[in-house]
């Protein structure tokens, strides 16, 4: 396991700053991957492979990267924006990292092992009916059966899940990659599909910063930024942390997300002195036993949902975040669709 983790770390560094030797070895494999991915998409679009259309409009929010684009807060913001406009929204997702493969419609008792950490976070954050399943169409059918008043479904991820037809495609693209010329497909790079794929989506949302001036793959460009909320106690979310009291305390930050440095930087930007940081693999299981000793341990919202039954210690705090998308992405989606029913 340690050797596998070390190899994965080397590959991820290579994706950010390519090593010439690795590029020489991996480039042919990326060429093969590109051909397979292109044929698969063509087969679905031509009807050679079957795809399913759900009885309500489907909006896919995904990416051409292999994770780490800041998509989950954007999905939450879009769903909330649609809800504010009176739309009854449902969410479907694969539910990466969960222990079961069965379709699961989330409820108040759902845990991360049932649904996956990101779908559970979206469900709790937005209150939108949510279902998970490796087949998005099957998850969508189950969701509509449980909540027949849903007027629109947002598919979290699944841009490459062509077995489900979609009415609107939204691709999230990290600002840090908008000026790069060395991006490549897996395994030489971290792209699932080539940059040209962005030409065919309905909109591109640039996340995490300002895009390069020459980056404009779509007529419909949006930008998102993350705003940190008020830190609250895990065992009592109504209790807000007075960060001033941390001045003489030992603070440790723990994150099991794709880009933990963003989380750690957010805390420092809030004026919090973090003595130690603990970066866990994305979607990693985490329990109270994994948390280090400290006066205060601050974790992400995504990790917080893994403590479904709470924990015995009172020194664990949660930093919530939200995405601000400009211009109005929810309004754009409704303009692309016709006659989306509003909630009664």
Swiss-Prot record:
Reactions catalysed according to its record: a lipid A disaccharide + ATP = a lipid IVA + ADP + H(+)
E.C. number(s) listed in UniProt: 2.7.1.130
GO cellular component terms, A-Z: plasma membrane
Annotated pathway: Glycolipid biosynthesis; lipid IV(A) biosynthesis; lipid IV(A) from (3R)-3-hydroxytetradecanoyl-[acyl-carrier-protein] and UDP-N-acetyl-alpha-D-glucosamine: step 6/6
Keyword Lyase: no
GO molecular function, one term: tetraacyldisaccharide 4'-kinase activity
GO biological process, one term: lipopolysaccharide core region biosynthetic process
One family name in Pfam for this protein: LpxK
Family classification: Belongs to the LpxK family.
Known function: Transfers the gamma-phosphate of ATP to the 4'-position of a tetraacyldisaccharide 1-phosphate intermediate (termed DS-1-P) to form tetraacyldisaccharide 1,4'-bis-phosphate (lipid IVA).
The protein, known as: Tetraacyldisaccharide 4'-kinase
Origin species: Neisseria meningitidis serogroup A / serotype 4A (strain DSM 15465 / Z2491)
UniProt lineage: Bacteria, Pseudomonadati, Pseudomonadota, Betaproteobacteria, Neisseriales
Gene transcribed to yield this protein: lpxK
